């Protein structure tokens, strides 16, 4: 019911699995429903935001990604597999993850599930490395 309310007041965004600059953007499909609990358009100077993510598909391709900010994620429903440099881990409902902006990771879903997470993003500009990497060998990389 809360998500329907957020959608009704314009706080829902369907995020595609690739952006307009991707060479195969014409093949893009919905990857996540993002609900803005706090700010729909957060200014870069504002220190945090609160969102709800309803995941619809695995992370795109074979690579890993990071974020432009540190964040906290709390799994509310479902769960997912998260690949980090230290291995692949099942994240069940109730899991709380604290991540730096430079933490490379990948999220994969159990077939037929739509995990729901509370996502609290921290301040922008704290990432030191590139946004994402493909075909990464975690044995030679450090987070």
List where the protein language model places each region.
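A short, N-terminal "cap"/entry segment at the start of jelly-roll beta-barrel domains
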Residues: 1-49
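Conserved short histidine dyad/triad with adjacent acidic residue
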Residues: 49-67, 101-102
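Short acidic-glycine-tyrosine-enriched beta hairpin
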Residues: 83-106
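Active-site or metal-binding loop neighborhoods of secreted/extracellular toxin and effector enzymes
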Residues: 125-143
